[in-house]
């Protein structure tokens, strides 16, 4: 499918609901920056050129997902840089059943302004949003909630909500981080409510939801008639109507 030269407004946040039995199928990544030669230098990536980087990063996605026919990949932004004509081929190369893409700052410039986005369709493989709010349900009870965004949203702490984000290119060793976002990354690590799912801090691979659910994330179960659940739902409804 050819890239269409048409500006499109993409809305959000969108609410995704999953049963607890599905959490083994959910993976996160961010800040792939396909075709971005300078990102190799900026982030000290161990690749000789963009061709090698693209191959390794997309091979790693498919190796991590494996042969799971129900795999869901949530990308927290900055999918591609520069040559967006490769966008469709790169998306098609990913084995996931469903791909949720958050709009990153580079996506706005390099994809959104040149492409007509497909409206939400349960049968479509790819869906774009400005932000996601993910609910995990255990039968009739809400098991946990977290937000998914490109920029970290750690001020969104309602009822212990956790945030998965990208943008910062947080490395594994923060002591060696001297980038412009180093101080922010350190504060977020201390905060404990945000997790940077970007490739630079996760061995250039996606992370599985079950691998980042424990430790930092507050677990709870709320029935829909619980007062706190009603408060949370009111917050979401107000946020979605903006």
Feature map (PLM): residue ranges:
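Short amphipathic alpha-helical segments and helix-helix/interface helices
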Residues: 62, 87-92, 183-185
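Conserved beta-sheet core of the metallophosphoesterase superfamily
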Residues: 117-235, 239
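N-terminal active-site segment of His-dependent metallophosphoesterases
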Residues: 1-87, 191-193, 197-201, 237-242
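Short, glycine/acidic-enriched loop or turn micro-motifs at the edges of active sites
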Residues: 34, 81, 107, 153, ...
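Extended active-site neighborhood of metal-dependent phosphoesterases/phosphodiesterases
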Residues: 6-18, 92-147
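A general structural motif
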Residues: 23, 68-70, 96-98, 143, ...
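Active-site neighborhood of phospho(di)ester-bond hydrolases with catalytic His/Asp-centered motifs
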Residues: 28-31, 73-78, 100-105, 148-149, ...
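Metal-dependent catalytic neighborhoods of phosphoester/phosphodiester hydrolases
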Residues: 76-95, 108-127, 156-159, 174-178
């Amino acid at each position: 499918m050819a890239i269409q030269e048409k500006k499109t407004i993409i809305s959000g946040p969108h609410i995704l609901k999953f049963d607890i039995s599905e959490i083994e199928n959910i993976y996160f990544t961010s800040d792939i920056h396909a075709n971005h030669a300078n990102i190799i230098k900026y982030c000290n990536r161990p690749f000789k050129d963009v061709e090698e980087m693209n191959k390794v990063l997309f091979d790693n996605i498919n190796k991590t997902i494996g042969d799971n026919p129900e795999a869901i990949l949530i990308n927290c932004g900055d999918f591609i840089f520069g040559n967006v004509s490769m966008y469709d081929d790169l998306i098609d190369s990913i084995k996931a059943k469903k791909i949720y893409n958050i709009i990153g700052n580079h996506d706005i410039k390099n994809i959104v302004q040149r492409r007509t986005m497909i409206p939400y369709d349960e049968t479509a493989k790819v869906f774009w949003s400005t932000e996601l709010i993910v609910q995990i349900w255990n039968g009739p009870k809400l098991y946990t909630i977290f937000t998914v965004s490109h920029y970290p949203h750690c001020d969104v702490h309602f009822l212990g909500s956790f945030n998965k984000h990208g943008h910062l290119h947080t490395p594994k060793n923060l002591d060696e981080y001297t980038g412009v976002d180093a101080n922010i990354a350190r504060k977020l690590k201390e905060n404990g409510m945000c997790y940077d799912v970007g490739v630079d801090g996760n061995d250039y691979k996606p992370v599985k939801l079950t691998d980042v659910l424990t430790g930092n994330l507050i677990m709870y179960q709320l029935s829909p008639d619980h007062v706190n659940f009603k408060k949370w739902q009111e917050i979401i409804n107000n946020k979605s109507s903006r």
